[in-house]
């Protein structure tokens, strides 16, 4: 099962997260029409450990989860929920009902904070708290 599918399933399965962002969880880019607060996740890098025969033994995947809000406090609250709930627990695929087993361990590595000017003329800034995690699996 893909790491992208696993990441989305873990984020959207946690009611503590969806209570804050509803269904506003998207990969790689936030649509301009998507309101706040929201989450944008990406998997920008994947390192492979291979055995002598060339087959992949272990994968280390970087997962970035951007928690966006018009309030820096709310962006941090969403980020804390992400850290709490993005664990190596088994996640079930909503469409097939099959357990997604690709991730064996999750390690939070850093948190970054930034802000952006509003794109819509609103006086409120957009605050982004990014949680960086490393997923390890086969």
Where does each model-flagged region fall?
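Acidic-leaning, charged glycine-interspersed low-complexity segments
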Residues: 86-137
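Oligomerization/assembly interface segments of phage tail-like spikes and tubes
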Residues: 57-75, 82, 123-135
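Long, highly charged amphipathic alpha-helices
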Residues: 6-10, 77, 81, 85
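Repeat-unit-sized solenoid/scaffold elements
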Residues: 69-73, 77-78, 104-110
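Surface-exposed beta-strand edges and their flanking turn/coil or helix-capping segments
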Residues: 40-41, 53-56, 78-80, 117-118
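Small/polar-rich, solvent-exposed N-terminal microdomains that initiate assembly or binding
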Residues: 1-55, 89-101
């Amino acid at each position: 099962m893909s790491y992208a599918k696993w990441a989305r399933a873990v984020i959207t399965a946690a009611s503590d997260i969806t209570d804050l962002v509803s269904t506003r969880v998207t990969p790689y880019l936030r649509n301009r029409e998507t309101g706040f607060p929201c989450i944008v996740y990406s998997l920008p890098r994947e390192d492979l450990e291979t055995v002598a025969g060339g087959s992949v033994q272990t994968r280390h995947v970087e997962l970035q989860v951007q928690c966006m809000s018009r309030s820096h406090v709310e962006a941090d609250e969403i980020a804390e929920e992400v850290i709490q709930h993005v664990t190596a627990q088994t996640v079930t695929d909503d469409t097939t009902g099959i357990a997604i087993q690709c991730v064996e361990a999750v390690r939070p590595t850093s948190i970054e904070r930034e802000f952006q000017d509003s794109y819509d003329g609103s006086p409120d800034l957009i605050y982004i708290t990014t949680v960086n995690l490393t997923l390890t699996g086969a």
